[in-house]
């Protein structure tokens, strides 16, 4: 290859996109040169070339008025060719001179290339090997100069035009780019503002005076390849506006012929002299019509990779692409509009004729006639025969396809190139017609009419990609994601506002499209999902509750009547009003409600009343949540969360006794369905503060049970009644709310009045006797002591009630804490069996520590269970398995004890599904039927083989497991569905929201956590997250590359564990 030539793969502009008709063409607003028509004298002498073009001249007369650009490419008309000397328009020579001046200038700093010592470099080229290696060592992986220039000098050179911008940059700018490592520039390079050539061009006609200072040398004129002749001056004496020259060509240069001038101009744009074959190689015997048919209408060379325009003219693919990009999308022959995407391959017969065309071999030693399709191989054989020192091969003549090059040129004076004022003037009549049509047919919607016209025009032009984009925008879809989708992604990936905004800007800058929505649109979407947006009404109105519906996050202490003697509350609390939160949750389930009505074949318009909503309430303390940051008052570093879950929605039709369930929560123990209501920094053992905060919640709850909610669902007003079931509490919280003594009390159970001794003697036969109303009556007896009894007698009468119950709880068993409590008990049994406590009644503390260490090592070895300080849900699930007890039995010496342990675990594993299952009658009917028998067998085994441990004592949860599970399942249908597991999982979300995207202030962070947690549980957003699950995982890995340690499951406080 010759030096300086490019192959099709290595071409400097190979990365230019195929869509040369840029959609922002109208924004560029190129200023076109104004060309005035010229009257010239008739032609006296015609050259043979001009005579050959007589048919073209006749054809031109029938077409539109010729332009200067048509003159460039051989189009002749009376207005353009009338001079005896065949001179062309002077403006063409001015542009040619302007382009030659640009070739000597630096694109980046504007200085002359000769002033910067060192080689020049192609702006649109690829990196040389030395430059690429130098930048690669500094971490830059770019491969083309346009990318490096954009990165270093912040200049986009991919849209440069040859008639406006220089194509080279100097060695100084190259040095600056290399020193900056391809990322930045350490020199302050001022980028010139390159403008198209005009009559006042500063480059061609510099305004600088000839003398810079008195007494100095005259400045040297700018070097140029062409010396401009004298400027024309206009003679306005005649109305024909003839152009005359002031001197008779003083330089002695003769005017170039029109065809020669045209050829020079084309060479500057197509640059295909070395790549395309001349038509002179065709034998003279070939008819002239055939030669014209196989000749490119742009470069006058033999067709290379021929394409055909819709107007039936033939061009080289590379030449027509460069031509349209430089001078506008017009056909060089007929001046019709030409879209490069509409170019097609000619007919196969024509291509076969072109391939079989005989050509004369250009080699002097050879005079063979060679077919065009084998011409390249024939020439290669000649070059291989020459053994030259220079490695020059004929692959210079790229006879394959050619890559488009971003060459410039002044565009045709098109509608898009006009100013806004000129566009309005030109389209005034059309605008009036469209407006009249829109008012008559489309109700005055001019925008829709114009967009539809544009859409139809794109479809007619086969530009379906752009048409699809326009149609998506018209339908409101567009490229960008819906604000609700962006909100769902932000909430579920735990992004703070600043993190999301950074992602939004990065994606927008990288892709050039606004895929993600800005933060203000997300805030608008939030308002519809948060409580306080939807209107509603209560009939009758709620007692002691405001009738306003637009209530957001409020202070948790609002509604607390403060007396003079009260001290300020040592807590911070934020909550939603209970009724407002329930309304927002129902509106979030609106689609599910309507879908349930359709599935049950119920008439939507008839179902406006009789709806019943069952709500599960949960409350739990989170323990220590201390943070190092946070301004505000000193508050306890413990927190309590109160939440609710809509379990089911049913409707009772008129005349029907049974209700029809139209919505059933499929995941009642998921954190996605457990909605937060109240957050507070308070110790759950602080009865007074907890009562003060939850008191207003209890009042709102009581008022709602006596009223009906009227709300619009599915476009119709419908009435709902609410039933609340407080089941998501652990035993500690139940005792706190029902006013019972602590869990170490003699009265072991929160469901019956049994003492610990009674429960150990009779482990199975007990029934539920406690209730909220009974506890209130017993509190009054405890407070008043009407029978004047002693303390022990009074305590025995009230069965462990020692404080006023302030919230009604459902007498039930919490499945999660039952698992944790029973696993803790089994862990202690395993220790005792390893140490053979049945033979040693009073072991020392050191012995117990040794047994525990042995058990931990065995569980770590066999079950991969790491020791924990407090029993949690995950550990309990792994411990209560057949594999775990078999591993423990390896450490038990006695065969009889091993069999007893295995039987004990087998019985437990048969009973466990009954209280863990969401619907035991469906999921495990056999275990449900055998539960009473299994529990009796379990109790007998404890009383006999493990009497050393259960002689006069038993744990609280073990008593409930053996005595009360069948009764609860018979009454409620399930225990597992009403567990507190969802609230416990929500505790982990509290910590994560607090760490990731909450303001670092105790006063405001509760509001942020409450808001984000509510959005996290939105069913509406969860549907979007299902569709975008994979993108969310990728984004979460991008913004949170370091995995945060999993929060431990909330534990049951077992002091001796």
Swiss-Prot record:
One of its GO terms (cellular component) is endodeoxyribonuclease complex. The gene is rag1. Transmembrane segments: none annotated. Keywords: Chromatin regulator, DNA recombination, DNA-binding, Endonuclease, Hydrolase, Metal-binding, Multifunctional enzyme, Nuclease, Nucleus, Transferase, Ubl conjugation pathway, Zinc, Zinc-finger. Residues 1-12 have a biased composition (Basic and acidic residues). The lineage of its organism: Eukaryota, Metazoa, Chordata, Craniata, Vertebrata. GO terms for biological process: adaptive immune response; B cell differentiation; chromatin organization; protein-DNA complex assembly; somatic diversification of immune receptors via germline recombination within a single locus; T cell differentiation in thymus; V(D)J recombination. Its EC number is 3.1.-.-, 2.3.2.27. A zinc finger (RAG1-type) spans 357-386. Residues 1-21, 39-61 are annotated as: Disordered. A divalent metal cation binds at residues 620, 730, 984. Residues 408-475 bind DNA. Zn(2+) 3 binds at residues 311, 313, 331, 334. Zn(2+) 2 binds at residues 296, 299, 316, 319. One of its GO terms (molecular function) is metal ion binding. This is V(D)J recombination-activating protein 1. Catalytic component of the RAG complex, a multiprotein complex that mediates the DNA cleavage phase during V(D)J recombination. V(D)J recombination assembles a diverse repertoire of immunoglobulin and T-cell receptor genes in developing B and T lymphocytes through rearrangement of different V (variable), in some cases D (diversity), and J (joining) gene segments. In the RAG complex, RAG1 mediates the DNA-binding to the conserved recombination signal sequences (RSS) and catalyzes the DNA cleavage activities by introducing a double-strand break between the RSS and the adjacent coding segment. Zn(2+) 1 binds at residues 272, 276, 299, 301. Binds 1 divalent metal cation per subunit. Mg(2+) or Mn(2+).
């Amino acid at each position: 290859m010759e030096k300086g030539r490019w192959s099709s793969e290595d071409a400097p502009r190979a990365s230019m996109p195929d869509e040369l008709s840029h959609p922002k063409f109208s924004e560029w607003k190129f200023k076109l040169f104004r060309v005035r028509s010229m009257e010239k004298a008739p032609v006296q002498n015609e050259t043979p070339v001009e005579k050959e073009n007589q048919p073209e001249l006749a054809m031109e007369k029938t077409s539109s008025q010729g332009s200067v650009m048509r003159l460039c490419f051989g189009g002749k008309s009376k207005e353009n060719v009338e001079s005896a000397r065949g001179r062309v328009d002077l403006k063409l020579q001015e542009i040619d001179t302007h382009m030659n001046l640009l070739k000597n200038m630096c694109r980046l700093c504007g200085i002359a290339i000769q002033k910067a010592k060192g080689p020049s470099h192609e702006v649109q080229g690829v990196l040389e090997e030395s430059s690429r290696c130098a930048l690669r060592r500094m971490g830059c992986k770019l491969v083309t100069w346009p990318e490096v220039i954009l990165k270093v000098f912040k200049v986009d050179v991919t849209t440069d035009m040859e008639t406006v911008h220089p194509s080279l940059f100097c060695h100084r700018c190259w040095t600056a780019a290399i020193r900056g490592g391809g990322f930045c520039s350490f020199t302050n390079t001022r980028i010139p503002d390159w403008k198209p050539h005009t009559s006042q061009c500063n480059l061609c006609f510099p305004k600088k005076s000839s003398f810079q200072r008195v007494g100095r040398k005259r400045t040297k004129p700018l070097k140029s390849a062409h010396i401009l002749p004298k400027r024309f001056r206009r003679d306005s004496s005649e109305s024909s506006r003839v152009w005359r020259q002031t001197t008779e060509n003083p330089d002695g240069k003769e005017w170039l012929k029109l065809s020669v001038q045209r050829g020079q101009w084309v060479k500057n744009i197509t640059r295909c002299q070395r790549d395309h074959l001349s038509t002179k190689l065709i034998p003279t015997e070939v008819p002239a019509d055939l030669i014209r048919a196989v000749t490119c209408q742009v470069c006058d060379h033999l067709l290379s990779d021929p394409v055909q325009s819709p107007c039936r003219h033939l061009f080289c693919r590379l030449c027509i692409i460069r031509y349209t990009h430089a001078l506008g999308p017009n056909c060089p022959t007929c001046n019709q509009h030409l879209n490069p995407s509409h170019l097609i391959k000619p007919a196969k017969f024509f291509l076969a004729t072109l391939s079989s065309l005989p050509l004369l071999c250009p080699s002097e030693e050879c005079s063979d006639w060679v077919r065009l399709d084998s011409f390249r191989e024939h020439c290669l054989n000649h070059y291989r025969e020459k053994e030259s020192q220079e490695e020059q091969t004929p692959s210079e003549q790229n006879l394959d396809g050619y890559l488009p090059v971003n060459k410039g040129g002044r565009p045709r004076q098109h509608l898009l190139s006009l100013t806004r004022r000129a566009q309005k003037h030109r389209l005034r009549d059309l605008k009036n017609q469209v407006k009249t049509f829109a008012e008559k047919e489309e109700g005055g919607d001019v925008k829709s009419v114009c967009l539809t016209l544009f859409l139809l025009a794109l479809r007619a032009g086969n530009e379906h990609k752009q048409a699809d984009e326009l149609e998506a925008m018209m339908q409101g879809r567009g490229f960008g994601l819906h604000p609700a989708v962006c909100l769902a992604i932000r909430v579920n990936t735990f992004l703070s506002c600043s993190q999301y905004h950074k992602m939004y800007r990065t994606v927008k800058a990288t892709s050039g499209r606004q895929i993600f929505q800005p933060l203000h649109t997300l805030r608008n979407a939030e308002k519809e999902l948060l409580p306080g947006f939807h209107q509603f009404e209560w009939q009758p109105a709620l007692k002691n509750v405001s009738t306003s519906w637009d209530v957001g996050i409020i202070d948790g202490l609002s509604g607390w009547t403060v007396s003079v003697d009260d001290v300020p509350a040592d807590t911070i609390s934020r909550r939603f009003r209970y009724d407002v939160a329930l309304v927002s949750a129902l509106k979030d389930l609106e689609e599910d409600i309507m879908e349930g009505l359709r599935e049950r074949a119920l008439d939507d318009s008839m179902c406006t009343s009789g709806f019943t909503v069952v709500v599960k309430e949960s409350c739990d303390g989170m323990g220590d949540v201390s943070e190092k940051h946070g301004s505000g008052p000193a508050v306890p570093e413990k927190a309590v969360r109160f939440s609710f879950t809509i379990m089911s929605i049913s409707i009772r039709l008129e005349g029907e006794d049974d209700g029809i369930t139209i919505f059933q929560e499929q995941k009642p123990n998921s954190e996605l369905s457990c909605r937060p209501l109240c957050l507070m920094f308070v110790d759950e053992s602080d009865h007074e503060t907890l009562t003060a905060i939850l008191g207003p919640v209890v009042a709102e709850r009581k008022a709602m049970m006596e009223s009906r909610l009227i709300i619009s669902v599915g476009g119709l007003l419908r009435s709902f009644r609410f039933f609340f079931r407080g089941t998501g509490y652990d035993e500690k919280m139940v005792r706190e709310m029902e006013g019972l003594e602590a869990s170490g009390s003699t009265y072991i159970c929160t469901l019956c009045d049994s003492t610990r001794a009674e429960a150990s003697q009779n482990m199975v036969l007990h029934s539920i006797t406690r209730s909220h109303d009974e506890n209130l009556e017993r509190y009054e007896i405890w407070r008043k002591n009407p029978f004047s009894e002693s303390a022990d007698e009074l305590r025995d009468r009230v069965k462990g009630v020692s404080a006023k119950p302030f919230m009604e709880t459902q007498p039930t068993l919490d499945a999660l804490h039952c698992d944790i409590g029973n696993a803790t008990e089994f862990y202690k049994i395993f220790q005792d069996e390893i140490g053979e406590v049945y033979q040693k009644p009073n072991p020392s503390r050191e012995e117990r520590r040794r047994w525990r260490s042995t058990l931990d090592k065995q569980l770590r070895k066999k079950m991969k269970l790491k020791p924990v300080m407090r029993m949690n849900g995950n550990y309990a699930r792994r411990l209560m398995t057949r594999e775990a007890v078999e591993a423990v039995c390896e450490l038990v010496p006695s065969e009889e004890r091993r069999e007893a342990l295995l039987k004990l675990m087998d019985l437990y594993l048969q009973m466990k599904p009954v209280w863990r299952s969401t619907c035991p009658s469906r999921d495990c009917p056999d275990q449900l039927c055998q539960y009473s028998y299994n529990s009796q067998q379990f109790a007998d085994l404890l009383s006999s083989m493990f009497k050393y441990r259960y002689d006069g004592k038993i744990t609280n949860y073990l008593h409930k497991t053996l005595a009360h599970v069948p009764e609860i399942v018979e009454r409620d249908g399930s225990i597992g569905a009403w567990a507190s597991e969802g609230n416990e999982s929500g505790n982990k979300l509290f910590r994560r929201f607090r760490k990731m995207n909450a303001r670092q202030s105790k006063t405001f962070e509760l509001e942020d956590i409450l808001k984000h947690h509510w959005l996290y549980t939105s069913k509406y957003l969860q549907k979007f997250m299902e569709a975008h699950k994979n993108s969310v995982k990728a984004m979460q890995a991008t913004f949170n590359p370091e995995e945060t340690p999993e929060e431990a499951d909330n534990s049951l406080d077992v002091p001796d564990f």
